[in-house]
């Protein structure tokens, strides 16, 4: 009894001491880098739901990041840990470029200050106005710009071309891809007139490049230095755990969607990308879906082919041990370690875009003198991946009578799973389906149109199969659903669940009280999560079509 009383007396002291230690740890930064040991991958995956695992970890020793809230959750597990120096503070000879006029852009052995980065991006547009358009897709927590460069020979007129996205450094301390992306823009623009391969790329592909997805993390201290850059954004949130997740749903990290996350979701929604890659560092590997679960993607054979091509070219253009940490230089994401809320899975599942995660360097922030190596090693691979966008199955879907382009679902029978189907994009009606060699049966469907199936469609690796499709329009009737569809909770707050969608349903739409279409959704499965993002309170109608019949059900967002 006396021991129990003494324990009660000392508990407040221990709690106060731990709080004081935590406050001390987070005194100068909102994130901490630390290590600990685990005995199994299952235990590691469980812990990954709490903190951000560092992808360079090799069991049993694990490295990780946490903010103050998630670190306290980790401490509750009573796992011994060691505080480590942050990767962003490893090197000091980073060679910062503080003036664009101070150096010729030849060796690219420097990191630009934030102001020089912005100046460089807009200088590309000024120097090549017919090939490059720079756009700010939004602002960070601290007000810095999220810049993307659109590269194509047709900047203002939509064409029947695949749309490809390269984006780097959503983790602010992983910046080998930052300068690599800038150099890729420069290389493509400078060589367009003289190099037939480059000219073919920009004449046949709409390429978008975002060199820096988390400038607040990269320039954490000030705009003139990347030393001690942080993984997280200015709210100390891991942006690569902040996206809707196929398995864990909206807000898998328990945080609001960050300004950077919202900007990228809106951007990718508006463009409709077909192919993408997300650049990181801290390891060297090409990481393909899925990250969140162990499900094998429908396109695993295609992924293995394309990822092996990327890694093999990188090995050929570097010294022997580059891209050799994993077998053939590639890995399945979940087989490596589990990630919920990642950008890669969001793009594949919700945007129907083929995206992989590219880990470029063991050092998250390499010294400036080493940056040219990563360019020479990856240049051919980056170009080859862009060129993959014109291969596979592609075509245009139109109305059989008017020739009007359609937004249609392209579904491969006995093949597509986990949202692997793709959709044709307006205003052209073009679709791009990447497949390994084989023979396929495809069904094309669109709202208000009769579905059409094509059997025995042959596709070959690194070649293009063209299939244009005309769909016949239905005569429509409308029915109000009363019991088939369930929408809850009602009234809804930040999100609402819709369940009971028939398997045969085509695209679904959200209509406001005025009858205007405010959002279109690509059918995932029998249920869907609608978020209130950027919508006002009021009545809405959930609408979809089955065999030409329109069904709708009303609900309210508070």
Region spans (language model):
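C-terminal outer-membrane/trafficking sorting elements
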Residues: 17, 479-488, 492-558
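Active-site/substrate-binding loop(s) of hydrolase catalytic cores
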Residues: 158-308, 316, 320, 347-349, ...
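Beta-strand-rich domain onsets/edges
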Residues: 366, 371-392, 463-464, 470-473
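A short, amphipathic beta-strand motif
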Residues: 393-400, 429, 469
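A short, solvent-exposed beta-strand micro-motif common in secreted/extracellular proteins
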Residues: 437-448
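Structured interaction patches on ligand/partner-binding surfaces of diverse proteins
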Residues: 447-473, 556-558
């Amino acid at each position: 009894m006396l021991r129990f009383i003494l324990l009660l007396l000392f508990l407040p002291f221990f709690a106060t001491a731990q709080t004081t230690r935590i406050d001390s740890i987070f005194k100068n930064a909102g994130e901490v880098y630390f290590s600990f040991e685990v005995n199994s991958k299952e235990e590691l995956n469980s812990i990954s739901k709490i903190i951000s695992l560092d992808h360079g970890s090799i069991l049993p020793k694990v490295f990780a990041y946490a903010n103050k809230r998630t670190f306290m959750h980790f401490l509750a597990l009573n796992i011994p840990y060691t505080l480590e120096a942050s990767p962003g503070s490893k090197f000091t000879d980073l060679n910062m470029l503080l003036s664009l006029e101070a150096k010729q852009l030849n060796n690219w052995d420097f990191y630009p200050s934030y102001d020089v980065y912005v100046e460089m991006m807009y200088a590309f547009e000024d120097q090549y106005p017919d090939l490059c358009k720079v756009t700010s897709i939004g602002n960070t927590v601290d007000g810095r710009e999220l810049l993307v460069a659109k590269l194509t020979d047709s900047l203002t007129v939509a064409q029947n071309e695949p749309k490809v996205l390269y984006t780097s450094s959503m983790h602010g301390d992983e910046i080998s891809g930052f300068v690599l992306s800038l150099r890729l823009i420069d290389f493509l623009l400078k060589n367009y007139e003289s190099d037939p391969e480059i000219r073919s790329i920009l004449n046949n592909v709409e390429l978008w490049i975002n060199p820096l997805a988390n400038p607040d993390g990269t320039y954490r201290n000030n705009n003139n230095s990347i030393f001690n850059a942080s993984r997280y954004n200015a709210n100390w949130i891991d942006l690569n755990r902040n996206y809707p997740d196929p398995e864990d749903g909206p807000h898998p990290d328990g945080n609001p969607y960050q300004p950077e996350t919202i900007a990228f979701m809106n951007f990718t929604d508006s463009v409709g990308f077909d192919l993408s890659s997300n650049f990181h560092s801290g390891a060297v590997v090409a990481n393909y879906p899925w990250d969140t679960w162990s499900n094998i993607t429908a396109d695993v054979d295609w992924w293995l082919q394309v990822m092996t091509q990327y890694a093999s070219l990188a090995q050929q253009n570097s010294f022997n041990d580059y891209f050799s940490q994993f077998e053939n230089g590639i890995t399945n994401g979940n087989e490596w370690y589990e990630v919920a809320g990642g950008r890669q899975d969001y793009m594949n599942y919700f945007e129907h875009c083929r995206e992989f995660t590219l880990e470029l360097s063991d050092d998250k922030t390499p010294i400036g003198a080493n940056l040219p190596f990563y360019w020479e090693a990856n240049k051919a691979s980056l170009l080859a991946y862009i060129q993959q966008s014109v291969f596979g199955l592609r075509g245009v879907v139109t109305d059989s009578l008017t020739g009007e382009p359609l937004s249609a679902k392209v579904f491969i029978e006995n093949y597509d799973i986990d949202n692997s189907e793709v959709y044709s994009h307006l205003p052209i009606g073009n679709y791009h389906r990447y497949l390994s060699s084989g023979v396929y049966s495809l069904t094309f469907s669109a709202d208000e149109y009769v579905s059409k199936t094509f059997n025995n469609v042959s596709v070959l690796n690194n070649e293009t199969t063209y299939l244009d499709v005309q769909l016949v329009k239905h005569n429509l009737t409308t029915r109000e659903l009363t019991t088939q569809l369930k929408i809850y909770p009602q009234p809804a707050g930040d999100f609402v669940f819709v369940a009971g969608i028939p398997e045969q349903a085509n695209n679904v739409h959200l209509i406001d009280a005025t009858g205007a279409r405010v959002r279109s959704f690509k059918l995932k499965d029998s249920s869907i999560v609608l978020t209130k993002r950027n919508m006002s309170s009021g009545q809405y109608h959930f609408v979809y079509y089955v065999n030409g019949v329109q069904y709708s059900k009303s609900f309210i967002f508070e």
